[in-house]
Amino acid sequence: MNTIITANNLFKKYGDLTAVDGISFEIQEGECFGFLGPNGAGKTSTIKMIHCVSPVTAGTLMVDGLPAHINNRVLKKKTGVIPQEITLDIDLTARENLMVFSRFFDIPRRVARERVAELLKFVELEAKRDSKINELSTGMKRRLLIARALLNEPRIIIADEPTTGLDPQARHLIWQRLRQLKRQGATLILTTQYMEEAQQLCDRIVIMHQGKILKEGAPSRLIEEEIGREVAEIRIAADQDEALIAQLGQFACGHERAGDTLFFYCRDGQSLWRKLNELDLPNTVHRPATLEDVFLKLTGRSLIE
């Protein structure tokens, strides 16, 4: 694969606030690359620099061989953005929203009509083409935003938390469409706080916290390296931790306390689970390790506001 985006020692500052703190990464053409992190981690600031709507404070950022400076129209024409906010004109129909947006890319009207019809079919909104925006569900609005992002046939698609607030059915439909775009050769850049979404869609991810990259890699590899394959959750009083760790620690590759729960991480859970059965502890859960475990281990389990 060819590298399509390269960041080297990238900074973004807003006055005295450092939102992006010297990060470096590469995104390969045709992959889905995810930025994960809690609120304020620097995900959106990074995305805005890639999309040339926010200037780079320091460092270098190259997109498709060009510097990503503010208002680089050449790069903007190669990029489609699915925003987190619903930015559709409520006075227009679904079809009219797409037709109006096509003018920003100087798409000839005849070509735009054909393209709009294709995209409404792609996002399963043909039957809603003449509906006003307020007549659409939230899931339909988000699918229309996907269609809008594809009008200019972009090489790079930025999806900024594309399924926020959606029910599971709508979320899975959007995942299907994003996977289809990737199969067609698009490079996807995803920001999300849904760990399952990142596992479903991303070839590689970075986990950001306080403007820095903590880890980078394939979701499955990060889970194996940071957590193992299985997790035991034991809801038990903290004053019993020492005794329990003494009995179970040899079977685990790590442990931590969070709130009312003691977590044990292991690569082979059979021995740990046999011991737990012997101890017959109440309030115990044994499950596969997930990307959420990695995320919480690296960024902390305390509430971040």
Predicted regions and their residues:
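ABC-family P-loop ATPase nucleotide-binding domain
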Residues: 1-11, 301-305
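Conserved protein kinase catalytic domain
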Residues: 76, 120, 223, 273, ...
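ABC transporter nucleotide-binding domain
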Residues: 175-267
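C-terminal coupling/interaction segments
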Residues: 266-305
